[in-house]
Amino acid sequence: MQKFTFFVSCAKGIELLLKDELERLGISSQEKLAGVEFEGSIKDAYKVCIYSYLASQVMLKVATDKVINQQDLYEFISSINWMDYFAVDKTFKIIISGKHYDFNNTMFVSQKTKDAIVDQFRNVTNQRPNIDTENPDNVIKLHLHKQFVNVFLCLNIDSLHKRSYRQFQGQAPLKESLAAAILIKAGWLEELKKHQPILIDPMCGSGTILIEAALMAKNIAPVLLNKEFKIFNSKFHNQELWDNLLEIAKNSQKVTNAIICGFDIDNNVLDKAQRNIYQAGVEDVVTVKRQDIRDLENEFESEGLIVTNPPYGERLYGDQLDELLDIFNGFGDRLSQDFYGWKVAVLTSFADSIKEMQLRTTERNKFYNGAIETILYQFEINEHAKFKHETQLEKNIRIAEASAQKSDEHIDFANKLKKNLKSLKPWLKQTGLECYRLYDADIPTFAVAVDVYSEHIFLQEYRADATIDQNIAKQRFYQAIYQIHKTLDIKYENIHTRVRQRQKGKEQYQKENDKNKFHIINEFDAKFYVNFDDYLDTGIFLDHRKIRQLVAKAAKNKTLLNLFSYTCTASVHAALKGAKTTSVDMSNTYLEWGKNNFTLNNIDAKKHSFIQADCISWLKTNKDKFDVIFLDPPTFSNSKRMDDILDIQRDHELLINLAMDSLKKDGILYFSNNYRRFKMSPQILEKFNCENIDKICLSRDFLSNKNIHNCWEIKYK
């Protein structure tokens, strides 16, 4: 029997389930995006059309090629011998999907394809096949991807998920194929192997889950319920084979003793469900009745499966939030109290409702109901199911996903993240940087800074203005967390948060937590330890990236004095270029951190100096001279270890004079601070050669915040 390549499309997220389904039909396939591909006969393709609960469309793969202009497209389509696929007296229709780099207009692609096909038939037969968009004999599908065009001949036009039984439905209907997918994922096929399988949908709506479960229990081929289904009349079509396979499917139905029950509190919805059940012919298996989910009782003799897609998120969310949460809280109580040993699966896009169930999930899987992203949460009701304690991470996730439901203003924040990332990508590729600022209060209502550290995000919330409602500010902050997770595909546990004033530099170093968890990041040829949880800052200032490079370059094979050295990142860069470094800081914690940074870079820390001291006091007694000095003081400090309070605007003249006393006559002092209203002392400008290098030190990712720091290069006259 002749073999072909077929592509079977499905809803995004169920590809593996479809692959397994084809395996059960004796067909080996490969997982692709939004479908699977297999080599097989027309009979194999017919079996998928008849028996698949999950497939949307079955297509014969005709050809694939790279196409860069309209002439390429015409020649590619013309190179296919269309008379091998259908006769000139058969009508056809062209559908286009995907996106192509060079073709923005899908109507143009369709027209060019039609021209190539019609011209080929006309040149050979002096006749042309006609287009029929309503009831064609054949459907040709072009899928565009980057610069490639994939050509398929469809075996069916209407999606296989349409079963025709669902003539009465609610406001947010669940696709039949998705209902089947969550049943399979939840374990219904395994449940059917039991002596008496049991399935409950306690929020059944119009009954889609119940009906799909019954079809599987009775081994009813889905295509038998699709009254609109039409197999296309291509030259490969074998009507006798198709009719024989349909007859086998009809004769394969069986009687089942499965118990399938649905409940809902809405009588109008239950009436729709009952009519759909009769339409599907499964009224002998499925029963429905009115019941509040909070009154759910276990009247069964053995354990079973509960699968549901709650409609309450759409019906009640908003003014009736409290009732919504109470419904799910009561549902969780009923499960933990009366359904020991049962398995439960809940499909929802409203994560906060799951939290209210107070049950520990065993598995979470993402599915799509059309364009709507949903999650299937699975539970096993046992002694470990009930939550004893909500972790801070779980709480943050719950609040973030609930906040995202309260308004859609965070969509602008998400779009800005995407726009900024797209803008930075060429620069990031060129520099190889993995740590950078992605967003800095670009939208006033989302006053946060988003710093990317490879797979982690450091999210700083600027303290809200007193005129801003604190609840609104909190909601926006959690919406930002949600969109960072969703838009940037960052795990929630990798989003680390801080609340602070806008850019005060190293104004305070107090310890925030005590997790003591360090991560390694790369910056050019150096590696550094960062800590996202225990301190106000991470251990590296991303906005100082360029001045670190300037300092390191100037100090190559020379001596460097790093004052207010923090975690010694500038010293590491310089040491990697052969500099002999001296790092001075008041904090022994940060100096030890700095030593660890040296060791991380395979630099012998013993060959460098680390001095714990008040920098002003140390400079007053220092006798050594250095080629390069990096002076990066905090804006303000009142540490007990200091002899006096440091105010950078007031004290910078003293600091610079003391630092210059330790600088060789041909040396360079790099002076940096983060005080936005900083003004250089006229006496310093008069005494030394001072050049402002703010623009030189401003990295691509900080262009929107040009006043983030003041940088100066100072030399002797």
Swiss-Prot record:
Boundaries of every THUMP domain copy: 44-155
Gene Ontology MF annotations: 23S rRNA (guanine(2445)-N(2))-methyltransferase activity; RNA binding; rRNA (guanine-N7-)-methyltransferase activity
Any one Pfam family match given in the protein's UniProt record, by short name: Methyltrans_SAM
Top EC class, one word: transferase
CC per GO annotation: cytoplasm
Subcellular location per the Swiss-Prot or TrEMBL entry: Cytoplasm
Enzyme Commission code: 2.1.1.173, 2.1.1.264
PROSITE patterns referenced in this protein's UniProt entry, alphabetically: THUMP, UPF0020
NCBIfam families, sorted: PRK11783.1
Purpose of the protein: Specifically methylates the guanine in position 2445 (m2G2445) and the guanine in position 2069 (m7G2069) of 23S rRNA.
Protein's name according to its UniProt entry: Ribosomal RNA large subunit methyltransferase K/L
Organism annotation: Francisella tularensis subsp. tularensis (strain WY96-3418)
Organism classification: Bacteria, Pseudomonadati, Pseudomonadota, Gammaproteobacteria, Thiotrichales
Gene name of this polypeptide: rlmL
